[in-house]
Amino acid sequence: MKLTCVLIAAMLLLAVCQLDSADATETGCKKDGSWCWIPSECCIESCLITCWY
């Protein structure tokens, strides 16, 4: 169940990062293809926070 949530969140984050690539690049969000796995001020972190907690 948790894995499904993480996969959905990852796809959502990737989509948002693609749409908001300019902002993501500025904050280093997509620097190493991390797709915002590291909590920072980029893209949507609330999705992962909801999944992890």
Curated annotation (Swiss-Prot):
Expressed by the venom duct. It is found in: Secreted. Residues 1-24 form the signal peptide. Its main location: secreted. GO terms for molecular function: toxin activity. Keywords: Disulfide bond, Knottin, Neurotoxin, Secreted, Signal, Toxin. Disulfide bonds join C29-C43, C36-C47, C42-C51. GO terms for cellular component: extracellular region. Probable neurotoxin. Belongs to the conotoxin O1 superfamily. The cysteine framework is VI/VII (C-C-CC-C-C). This is Conotoxin Cal6.27. The lineage of its organism: Eukaryota, Metazoa, Spiralia, Lophotrochozoa, Mollusca.
